[in-house]
Amino acid sequence: MKTSVFAAILGLALFAVLCSGSELQEKDLKETLLSAIMETALEAQPEERECRYLFGGCKTTSDCCKHLGCKFRDKYCAWDFTFSK
């Protein structure tokens, strides 16, 4: 009787160890897949550029913020003499 109880407890302990090991592997797999999906999603989104503020360096007028234009000679953003409403 003692032997069968000991064998049953040993079997349950072994089963618990195996289940926890497979659960850890499954959790690690989920984390790996989630991080791969997040990286792919971040790469797929276009990067938004911030506009250049007053006296910021620029190459074209589209680099500058609203109501600023790129001065061709010195290549900096300056007021383009427009007003907002």
UniProtKB/Swiss-Prot annotation:
Its main location: secreted. This is Kappa-theraphotoxin-Gr1a. Inhibits Kv2.1/KCNB1 and Kv4.2/KCND2 voltage-gated potassium channels. Acts as a gating modifier by shifting channel openings to more depolarized voltages and acts via the occupancy of multiple binding sites on the channel. The toxin binding sites are situated on the S3-S4 extracellular linker of the channel. At least two hanatoxin molecules can occupy the Kv2.1/KCNB1 channel, and maybe more (three or four). Can also inhibit calcium channels (Cav2.1/CACNA1A). Needs to partition into the membrane in order to bind to the channel. The record marks W79 as: Involved in active face. The record marks R52, K71 as: May be involved in interaction with voltage sensor. The presence of a 'disulfide through disulfide knot' structurally defines this protein as a knottin. GO terms for molecular function: calcium channel regulator activity; ion channel inhibitor activity; potassium channel regulator activity; toxin activity. GO terms for cellular component: extracellular region. It holds the Pfam family Toxin_12. Residues 22-49 form a propeptide.
